[in-house]
Amino acid sequence: MRLHLLEHDPDELSDTHLIQWAKQKGHAVGQTYLCKNEKPPALDEIDWLMVMGGSPSVWEEDKYPWLIPEKELIARALVHNKIILGICFGAQLLAQALGGTVSANCPKEIGWHDVNLTKAGRRSFLFRGIPDRFTTFHWHSNCFTVPQGCTRLAFSEAT
């Protein structure tokens, strides 16, 4: 499988464990920093799009103009039935593209917090080998509604 990561903060590196996992499984991995005006590959060159976290909010196109082509890319990937995984800010972008509502009125979670898998999350290959409840580092103050037709796989106290 050809995985491609969309990155949002030029000074942050994606979880090297994620990249190592993908490579160990025999997947090709690419990365694009849209915030550095890098161009992503054509959709026919990727199978799985991973939209990573970042500090912007989904409504800040004026401050981060690269959000406009990123949102267009996500919409095209959905139309072409690409596998898309959104993490943190990436999940907000994906939820918005699918008709969910992103808002800034949820409690901030900054620091180490528990994540709980839902029943669907426990069955998902994405969480194979992961405990039903685990602790990970959070840094977010925005949240989103799960769009119609989508399935929540995990949640924290604030989400």
Predicted regions and their residues:
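Pocket-forming structural segment of enzyme catalytic cores
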Residues: 98-159
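Short loop/helix-cap segments at secondary-structure boundaries that form the rim of catalytic
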Residues: 39-44, 93-95, 145-149
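Phosphate-binding glycine-rich loops and adjacent basic patches that engage nucleotide phosphates
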Residues: 29-40, 87, 108, 149-157
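Cysteine-nucleophile active-site neighborhood
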Residues: 52-124
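Short alpha-helical
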Residues: 12-13, 92, 145, 159
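N-terminal beta1-alpha1 cap of cysteine-dependent amidohydrolase-like domains
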Residues: 1-80
